[in-house]
C-alpha cells in the first residue's frame, strides 16, 4: 500500500513548478507577494497557488481520490519587483475546471477568497488576470456594448457628456427632476443619480423615476436628441433591484445604473442579463473600489475589477480621470481603459498589463471619466480618453 507522511509540509514541493508550460485554457494570475521575513519567495508563491486552488496545510487521505496534477494551481514563475525590497511578482496558473462557468463570484471566491489572510504573507496584491476565451465565452458580458449604445442614442464620433445631479442628497423628487431637465435641455446627453441615491425618506425611488422620466421626455421633445438619466436601481435585495429596473423599462427610459462592488457581482450579472433582454443600457459605478485597490502592495488592482465587470456586464464604468495626477498613473489608467474597450490587448508591463488579453468578440465598455472634472479639463480628457468615453462632470 502507498503510505504517506502526515504533518505540515512545504507548499513548494507540490505547487512551485517553474518548468510548467501554461495552457491556452488556464486562468493566469499575477500576484505581488510580500513574504514574511524568513519565508522564501518560492514558498510564498506556492502557498498562494495552493490556498487559492486545491491545497490545505497537510496531506489528507482524500487527496488519493482525485488527481491533484489535474486540479492544482501552479506557481510557474517568480520575479523580484524592481526597486522594492522583499517583494515579488508570483505568476500562478489555474486549470479551467476549478471555476464555475459564467460566475465572476466563483472566480473571485476561488482566486482571492481565502489567501489574503495567510500567515506566511505580509501582504498580497492581485495585479492582473488573464481570462482565456474558453472562460470568457461562458459570460454574456456587457448588455449592449459601445457600438450598439451609439446606435441606440444616434450619437457618433465624440465622447458622450454627462453630469451628476447635486446636491446628491436632500432634494425632493420634483426639484431633482427639474435639475435633470435643465441639464439635458442645456445640451448634455446624460444626467446621473449619485451612487448613494437609492430610496431614502426624502425621495423614494419611484417618485424620482417618474419625475426624471418626465424631464427626459420634455428635453427630448425640445431638442430632438435622445437623452438619458442613469436611474440608480441599486437596492437592499436583488429582487428589489430588478423591480426598479422593470419600472425603468416600463417608463421607457434608456438606461439604469448599478453600484457593482457594493451591490455584488451576483446581483450585477443578474441585472446585466435583464438589461440585455429588455433593451436597457447599464451604467456601472465603482463605489467602494478604493477600499480594495488603493494600497500599492495589498488588495486587488482596479484593472482586475474592470476585467471582471466586462465579464459580469456593464455598458459604462467609472475609471478615474487621470487629470492633474501623476504621469505614470496615466499609462496605467489607459492600460485598463484599453482592457475595457478593445478586443485584443497586448502584454505591456509599462502600462501594468501583465498578460496579453484576448476578449474575442465580447462587447466593449465605455470608460467614464468622473470626479472633480470641469470644462478646463476638456482638452486633456479628449486627448487621454479619445472618442469612446463618457465625460461625467460635477
From Swiss-Prot:
GO terms for molecular function: magnesium ion binding; monooxygenase activity; ribulose-bisphosphate carboxylase activity. The basic functional RuBisCO is composed of a large chain homodimer in a 'head-to-tail' conformation. In form I RuBisCO this homodimer is arranged in a barrel-like tetramer with the small subunits forming a tetrameric 'cap' on each end of the 'barrel'. One of its GO terms (cellular component) is chloroplast. It is found in: Plastid, Chloroplast. InterPro entries: RuBisCO, RuBisCo_large_chain_AS, RuBisCO_lsu_C, RuBisCO_lsu_C_sf, RuBisCO_lsu_fd_N, RuBisCO_lsu_N_sf. Transmembrane segments: none annotated. RuBisCO catalyzes two reactions: the carboxylation of D-ribulose 1,5-bisphosphate, the primary event in carbon dioxide fixation, as well as the oxidative fragmentation of the pentose substrate in the photorespiration process. Both reactions occur simultaneously and in competition at the same active site. It comes from Barclaya longifolia (Orchid lily). The keyword Oxidoreductase applies. The record marks 325 as: Transition state stabilizer. Substrate binds at residues 114, 164, 168, 286, 318, 370. Mg(2+) binds at residues 192, 194-195. This is Ribulose bisphosphate carboxylase large chain. It catalyses: 2 (2R)-3-phosphoglycerate + 2 H(+) = D-ribulose 1,5-bisphosphate + CO2 + H2O; D-ribulose 1,5-bisphosphate + O2 = 2-phosphoglycolate + (2R)-3-phosphoglycerate + 2 H(+). The active site is at residues 166, 285. Its cofactor is Mg(2+). The modification N6-carboxylysine is found at residue 192. Heterohexadecamer of 8 large chains and 8 small chains. Keywords: Calvin cycle, Carbon dioxide fixation, Chloroplast, Lyase, Magnesium, Metal-binding, Methylation, Monooxygenase, Oxidoreductase, Photorespiration, Photosynthesis, Plastid. Its EC number is 4.1.1.39. Binds 1 Mg(2+) ion per subunit. GO terms for biological process: photorespiration; reductive pentose-phosphate cycle.
Amino acid at each position: 500500500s502507498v503510505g504517506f507522511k502526515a504533518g505540515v509540509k512545504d507548499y513548494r514541493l507540490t505547487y512551485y513548478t517553474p518548468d510548467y508550460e501554461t495552457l491556452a485554457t488556464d486562468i493566469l494570475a499575477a500576484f505581488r507577494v510580500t513574504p514574511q521575513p524568513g519565508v522564501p519567495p518560492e514558498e510564498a508563491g506556492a502557498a498562494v497557488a495552493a490556498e487559492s486552488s486545491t491545497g490545505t496545510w497537510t496531506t489528507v487521505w482524500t487527496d488519493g481520490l482525485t488527481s491533484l496534477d489535474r486540479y492544482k494551481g501552479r506557481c510557474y514563475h517568480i520575479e523580484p519587483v524592481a526597486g522594492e525590497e522583499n517583494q515579488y511578482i508570483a505568476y500562478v496558473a489555474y486549470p479551467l475546471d476549478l471555476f464555475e462557468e459564467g460566475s465572476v463570484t466563483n472566480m473571485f471566491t476561488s482566486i482571492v477568497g481565502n489567501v489574503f489572510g495567510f500567515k506566511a504573507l505580509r501582504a498580497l496584491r492581485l495585479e492582473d488576470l488573464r481570462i482565456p476565451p474558453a472562460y470568457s465565452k461562458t459570460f454574456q458580458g456587457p448588455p449592449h456594448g459601445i457600438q450598439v449604445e451609439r446606435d441606440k442614442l444616434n450619437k457618433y464620433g465624440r465622447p458622450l457628456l454627462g453630469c451628476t445631479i447635486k446636491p446628491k442628497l436632500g432634494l425632493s423628487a420634483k426639484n431633482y427632476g427639474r435639475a435633470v431637465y435643465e441639464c439635458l435641455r442645456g445640451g448634455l446627453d446624460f444626467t446621473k443619480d449619485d451612487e448613494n441615491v437609492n430610496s431614502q425618506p426624502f425621495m423614494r425611488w419611484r417618485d424620482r423615476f417618474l419625475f426624471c422620466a418626465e424631464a427626459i421626455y420634455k428635453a427630448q421633445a425640445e431638442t430632438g436628441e435622445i437623452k438619458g438619466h442613469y436611474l440608480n436601481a441599486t437596492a437592499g435585495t436583488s429582487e428589489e433591484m430588478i423591480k426598479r429596473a422593470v419600472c425603468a423599462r416600463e417608463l421607457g427610459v434608456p438606461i439604469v445604473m448599478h453600484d457593482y462592488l457594493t451591490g455584488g457581482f451576483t446581483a450585477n450579472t443578474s441585472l446585466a442579463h435583464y438589461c440585455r433582454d429588455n433593451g436597457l443600457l447599464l451604467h456601472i459605478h465603482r463605489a467602494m473600489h478604493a477600499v480594495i485597490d488603493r494600497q500599492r502592495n495589498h488588495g486587488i488592482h482596479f484593472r482586475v475589477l474592470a476585467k471582471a465587470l466586462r465579464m459580469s456586464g456593464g455598458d459604462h464604468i467609472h475609471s478615474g480621470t487621470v487629470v492633474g495626477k501623476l504621469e505614470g498613473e496615466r499609462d496605467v489608467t489607459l492600460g485598463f481603459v484599453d482592457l475595457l474597450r478593445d478586443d485584443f490587448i497586448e502584454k505591456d508591463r509599462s502600462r501594468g498589463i501583465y498578460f496579453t488579453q484576448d476578449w474575442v468578440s465580447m462587447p466593449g465598455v465605455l470608460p467614464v471619466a468622473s470626479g472633480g472634472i470641469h470644462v478646463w479639463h476638456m482638452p486633456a480628457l479628449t486627448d487621454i480618453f479619445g472618442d469612446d468615453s463618457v465625460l461625467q462632470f460635477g
